[in-house]
Amino acid sequence: MDVARANSVMQTAAVAVARFMQQYDVILAPTLAEPPLELGRINLSPGISMAEWGPRVAAFSPFTQMANWTGQPSMSVPLGQSREGLPIGVMFTGRYGDEALLFRLAGQLEMAPPWAGRRPNLAAK
């Protein structure tokens, strides 16, 4: 698919999503399909082609793809945690131009347990 055709497809999707979102204030979805991974697991390393890397990323974060393609305002915020204490995120996706609602929702979650006052353990040598 050439660049002009790809842009046309993305624009068509953006218009369809805008129409769909007129019915909803926010769509809530998991940010990732599984708990957070160790750093570097899905990096684009020299031995991995884009054909291999793309599906890895899409499988790990399938719920973020539509917002990325259409430019919808979305925000990932921690809502729970894994057994290892890693944050488990949820993604709010809103209407075009209504980013303020996403920030208000995220602010309310940050004030609620277990995240209120929680800070990571950092060490410097």
Language-model features: where?
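Serine-dependent amide/ester hydrolase catalytic core
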Residues: M1-W69, P120-A124
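Structural helix-boundary/capping segments
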Residues: V3-A4, S8, V15, A58, ...
